[in-house]
Amino acid sequence: MLVPVLTLLGTLTATGTLVYHFDERLPVVRFRLLTTFLVLSSGQLLLYALWKVFLKPLCFSPFKHLPKPPLDQWPLWRDHEDGQRGGRAQVGIIHCRGILNGERLIVSSPTALAKIASDNYTFIKPMAIKLLAGRVLGMGLVLTERDEHKQQRKLFLPPFAPKHIRDLYPTFWRKSREVTERMGDEIHATGAGNGVFEIGEWAARVALDIITLSTMGKDFGSVRDADAPLAKVYHTVLQPTLGHVVIAVLKNFLPARLVEALPLRSNRHQGDAYDTIRGVCRDLLREKKDQLAGHHLGGKDILSVCLRYEDIAGVDEEEVINQMTTILGAGHETISVGITWAIYMLCLHRDWQARLREEVRATLPSPDRAQESASSADVERMPLMRAFLEEVLRWYPPIPMTMREPLVDTELDGQYVPRGTRIVVPIKAINREERYWGPDAKRFSPSRWLKNDREFNPSGGVSSKYGYLSFMHGPRSCVASEFARAEMACVVSAWVGRFDLDLSDEHFRDEENMRTSNGNFSGKPLEGLYVRAQVLEGW
C-alpha cells in the first residue's frame, strides 16, 4: 500500500484530538469528524507522496552516487538489458527508477549475484510478482519463500532426479513424433509442399501435452486439438496483454483482493483459469491416490513417482496441488518459449540447421518408425544439438529477468541496501556479458559449448557460473532444468530432422526487429514467430 497503516491511524488520532478538544478554537475542525479526517488524511497523503516520489529518491537516496542508464527510468515492461548496457554494466550495480520513481538496483557482479543466490532466503521475490502470478502458477516452488520453500524443495526435488527424467524420454519422443506428424499432415493437405506455422503456438501445444503426460500421466490432446480446454485456458492467461500489466501495476498500490474484484476481463479470465487448472489437478491427484491405495500405482510420471515417496504421500492435498499447478504453468510455458527461440535461431543460422539435421538423422529414429523411441543415451550422443540448445538458452533465456527484495538491511559489493529495495537480476543481459564470456559474448556461437568441435563442453567457457543464469543457482535454482533440456532436445530434433525451416517474414531476419514480451511471465516473441516449414524426405 502507498500509505502505511500507521499513517492512517495517526490521522484518526489527530482527528479525534482536534474535534473533541479544539472544536471551537480551530476553524478547520468546525466541519466535524469526517471532514477533518478527510482534510488531514489528504494532506498526509500529499506529503507522503511528495516524500516517496520526489524527495527520498531524488535527494536522500543512498544510491545517488551509483551509475545510471541514460534514460534513468523505464516503463514496467521494458527490457532491462538496454538499461544495463547503457549504464556501464561492468561496474556491477546500476541505479535506476521505476514507476513513480521507485528505486531499483540492477545487479550483475559475480559477488553480488553469489550473495543473492546463496542467501536466497533473505532475498525474496517481491510481493507484486506473487500477486500477479500466484493465481495461475499456484504457491509452489516458484513463488514460496524461506522455510516453506526449503521444505517444498526437499520434498519435490527427488522426483526430478536424472534417473526419473531418463524414464520420461519415450514420452518426450512420442509427443514430438505426434506434433511432427500433425504439422506434416497440414502441409500435405495444402498440396503446396510447405506451410506456415506460428511456432510459439505449436510449441505451447506440444509442451503442454508433454508436461501433463510426464507429470500427471494424462494426455489432454492439445496437439490434436488447439481448442482443447486446458490449452485454451493457458493460451488465454499467459498471453502478454495490457490487462495483465494493468493488474500488476494496480497490485503494487491496492489490496490484491480489491484488484481481483474489479470487473476486468483479465481478472475474469484468471479467475476461471484458476478454478479450471486446480480442478484438473485435484481430480488427477485423487485418482492417483486411489490407485496408490489399491497398490496399482505403477506409472513413471512425476506425480506417480511423488506419491511413491512416503514423505510426499502424506503431504496436504492443497500443497501437492500447488506444486502441480506450478509445474504445469511455469514448466510448459518456459519450455515452449525455449523451443520457440531455438527454431528462430535455426532460421537465422541455417548452417547450424543443416549440421543439426545431419546429426539428428544419423542418431535418432525417424518419426515414421512408431515402434522405436529416442533415449537419453541418444541425446547425449548429439553434441551439436546439446551445444546449440545451450547457446539458445544463454542467448534467449525463457525468463529474461527476475527480481528480489532483501528482508533486512544488507550490503552488496559494499553498497548499503535498505530492506525492501527492488533488485533486478537481468538474466538475459548477464548471459551476454563480456566479463563472463569473453570478447564474443554478444555473438550467438554454439561452438563455445564444444571441445574440438565434436565433444560437448557443459561449461561453455564461462568464467563464473553466475554468468549463466538461465536456470539460476543456489536454493532457487530450477529443479526441472534437466527435464527442460531433454524435452527441448526431443521436440527440436524431430522438427529439424523432418522439416526445412525458414522465416516467413524477412523483417525478422534482423534480431533488432524481434520484440519480446519481457513484462509477462516469460520473454517470447511479442508478435509470434511465423515459420515456413517444408517436408524433407529421407528420414
Curated annotation (Swiss-Prot):
> Which Enzyme Commission number(s) are on file for it?
1.-.-.-
* Keywords from the named record: Antibiotic biosynthesis, Glycoprotein, Heme, Iron, Metal-binding, Monooxygenase, Oxidoreductase, Signal
Pathway participation: Mycotoxin biosynthesis
- List the cofactors: heme
Pfam families for the chain: p450
- InterPro entries listed in its UniProt record: Cyt_P450, Cyt_P450_E_grp-IV, Cyt_P450_sf, Cytochrome_P450_monoxygenase
Lineage, top-rank taxon, reads Eukaryota
**Residues the entry annotates as binding heme:** 478
Where is carbohydrate linked to this protein? 120, 520
Q: Which family does it belong to?
A: Belongs to the cytochrome P450 family.
The protein in question is named Cytochrome P450 monooxygenase buaD
Q: Which organism is it from?
A: Petromyces alliaceus
| Gene behind the chain | buaD
